[in-house]
Each structure stands twice: as C-alpha cells, then as structure tokens.
Amino acid sequence: MTADFENIEQLLRDSKPDEAIARLEAYLATPVASCLDVAYYLLGNAYRQKSDWRKAINNYNRAVQLNPDGPAKTALQTAKEILDFFNHDLYNP
C-alpha cells in the first residue's frame, strides 16, 4: 500500500471522510492510477462513515470486481447485513 493510501486511512481514522473522498476521487481521476481496488475500498469506507450506503456499496462492488479476494468483499457483505438489519424496508437485494 502506498503512502497516499496510508494517509487516507489516517483521515478515515480521524473521522475526516470528506477530505478522504476528495483525495481518493482525485487519485482515481489520474490516468495511471494503480491499486484501484484499494482506492475503491477506501472510498467505500469514507462513504460508509458518512452513512451514504448507496455510494459505499457501489464502491465496494467496484473493488470486489477488481479483486474478489480483497477486504472489500467482507466490507460489502457487512454493509449489506447492516442495511438489511436496520433498514429492511429500504434495502431489498
């Protein structure tokens, strides 16, 4: 994992999802971005912190498509379980 991702993880630990989102979106806009699965996973985490479940799940799905065995797989399942438990009427898989 690059130093940039470590800085973004620190922003998330510091409850600064908006700054993390801005950095990740700028990173993903670069034409030579690598480690895309990690970037989408972290972006999903940032949106989860903001309780934007739709964007969190969309980004976890992108990460899983790129790396089916990465940490986004568990995060995606957890997000779906949380929504199913707390917002059963709003979430219908």
Language-model-detected regions and their locations in the chain:
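"A position-specific structural signal for the A-helix of alpha-solenoid helical repeats
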Residues: E6, Y41-L42, A75
